[in-house]
């Protein structure tokens, strides 16, 4: 039996760990520090699956009926 991937489920939005260059752009655009972003526990099943570590920022790309895509950012904590 193969392992089920949460990311393959249709109700789970796409998650990706941001690189530092993209992160700086986002933080500057919103005029925030990474610690001010909503939190995501390192023990969250999605964080475990994508290999997120404390201090990372995860970009969540959700489908939106009005905007097409909506971007959310989460700061990974221990």
From Swiss-Prot:
Record localization: Cytoplasm
Superkingdom of the organism of origin: Archaea
InterPro entries: Arch_Rpo5/euc_Rpb5 (IPR014381), RNA_pol_subH/Rpb5_C (IPR000783), RPB5-like_sf (IPR035913)
Enzyme class, broadest EC rank: transferase
Entry keywords, A to Z: Cytoplasm, DNA-directed RNA polymerase, Nucleotidyltransferase, Transcription, Transferase
Catalyzed reactions per annotation: RNA(n) + a ribonucleoside 5'-triphosphate = RNA(n+1) + diphosphate
Enzyme Commission number, as recorded: 2.7.7.6
Record text on subunit structure and interactions: Part of the RNA polymerase complex.
Similarity-based family: Belongs to the archaeal Rpo5/eukaryotic RPB5 RNA polymerase subunit family.
Function: DNA-dependent RNA polymerase (RNAP) catalyzes the transcription of DNA into RNA using the four ribonucleoside triphosphates as substrates.
Protein name listed in UniProt: DNA-directed RNA polymerase subunit Rpo5
Organism: Methanococcoides burtonii (strain DSM 6242 / NBRC 107633 / OCM 468 / ACE-M)
